[in-house]
């Protein structure tokens, strides 16, 4: 699998006009993949504007199947930011159950990428990696999580802390060599090089891209991410 950048519109972003804008920018920037909400209207809008690999994200097997039927190429389970915002922490068993339901619903129609919750211990994440690989999951995405549960207290993480945690999780999981790893959470042009050095095959760019105000700034961020990735790949070639 060739290393790639994935632009992330956001799992909670169901504003079709905004999704259309982000899809247009991603296409102009030349990134290989775009990730949108599995909401059918968002998927159809993005599919009409973006020629690369289209990921659709949800925390529902039914929503993922509908997204694939609407034109998405890859179903992605996660992320879980909405849950963390509400102080909810999805468990490993809950993710495994959702993954099994998603694989059953998809029935081979499309590959499944699963986000492993960033708040779980490394040992649990590794167990999940192997179990998901055995079940037929195609790719893992790491996250930093916007909140952690520590000593029974909810602890908020800033962007740098999210990125650091996601990078650490990616390095740990990539070293297992079971599945391709994608790094997301707090990743931007400033740390794409660190993301690639973890052994990951792909990098997800979210708020560093989708929270910007102008199309020019969004495109420049994605292009800078690609330049940074290519520099790392050239250095290790």
Task: Please name every model-derived segment.
Residues 1-72, 129-137, 217-230:
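Conserved N-terminal beta1-alpha1 strand-loop-helix module at the mouth
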Residues 3-9, 34-36, 54-58, 75-77, ...:
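Hydrophobic faces of well-ordered beta-strands that scaffold small-molecule active sites
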Residues 16-18, 25-29, 38-39, 52-111, ...:
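Active-site beta->alpha loop and helix N-cap motifs at the rims of alpha/beta catalytic domains
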Residues 21-22, 59-73, 120-135, 175-203:
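Catalytic cores of alpha/beta
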Residues 39-63, 90-114, 157-185, 189, ...:
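Alpha-helix-loop-beta-strand connector modules within alpha/beta enzyme cores
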Residues 99, 126-129, 137, 170:
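A general structural signal for well-ordered alpha-helical packing
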């Amino acid at each position: 699998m060739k290393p790639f950048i994935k632009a992330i519109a956001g799992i909670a972003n169901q504003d079709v006009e905004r999704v259309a804008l982000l899809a247009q920018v991603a296409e102009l920037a030349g990134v290989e993949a775009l990730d949108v909400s599995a909401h059918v209207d968002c998927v159809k809008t993005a599919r009409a504007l973006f020629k690369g690999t289209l990921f659709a994200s949800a925390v529902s097997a039914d929503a993922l199947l509908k997204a694939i039927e609407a034109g998405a190429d890859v179903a992605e389970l996660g992320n879980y930011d909405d849950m963390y915002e509400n102080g909810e922490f999805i468990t490993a068993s809950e993710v495994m159950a959702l993954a099994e339901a998603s694989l059953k619903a998809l029935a081979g129609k499309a590959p499944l990428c699963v986000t492993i919750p960033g708040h779980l211990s490394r040992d649990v994440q590794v167990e999940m990696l192997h179990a998901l690989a055995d079940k037929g999951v195609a790719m893992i995405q790491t996250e930093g999580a916007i909140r952690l549960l520590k000593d029974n207290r909810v602890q908020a993480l800033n962007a740098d802390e999210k990125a650091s945690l996601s990078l650490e999780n990616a390095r740990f999981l990539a070293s297992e060599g079971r599945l391709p790893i994608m790094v997301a959470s707090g990743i931007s042009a400033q740390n794409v090089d660190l993301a690639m050095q973890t052994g990951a095959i792909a990098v997800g760019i979210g708020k560093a891209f989708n929270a910007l105000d102008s199309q020019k700034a969004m495109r420049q961020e994605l292009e800078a991410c690609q330049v940074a990735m290519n520099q790392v790949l050239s250095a290790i070639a």
